[in-house]
């Protein structure tokens, strides 16, 4: 965009090209993974009443340590949802629920200016690294004086623990009615906190809301496989060999 000699006519043919956009959408559909579908809950092909609670994205630091403000939003815009289902204002009026959450985000992502190196947690609850190695030979940051970057005994806090709280609340409100979880994943996740609360789980990687609706409603079928293993626990993360593939104890769901 900074090139003053760009071919404007060629740009018009490429940017926003419907064919290219459709190809991109197809790839989004093919990237979503269904990791749980208890009693063949999905697809929900009939036009039903669905409860999709608002999600709170809490204030927190980005990778570059800029602070993003808190945001409360509807995961699926109304103009998209109305193509598939009727919107239920609460769990009482819903036939089923869809809860959107993000994978756990560790505060400061492994390094705190006061504490030094800290764990990166893959769970929502606070995690204290009691089983981490006592000595780590990877020095890391050249500005760090210590040659040992071990975080044994230190605690990691998850910024978006409210995602788990939201799911727990909706599960309680829905009672025996089905709950679908959409896990927007950026890190492998310890699933034992959320899997027992869900009847079906879709895992996506930065795709648009309509993709999930197409898959939940059965207009399209999920076909992707996980690109990572999902650990049984944080202890399993600590004990595995980072340089050995498929070396981690994976979570097994109720099915």
Describe each model-derived feature in a short phrase.
Residues 1-4, 9:
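Long, well-ordered, tryptophan-enriched scaffold segments
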Residues 8-9, 14-255:
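C-terminal non-catalytic regions of proteins with extracellular/luminal or membrane-system context
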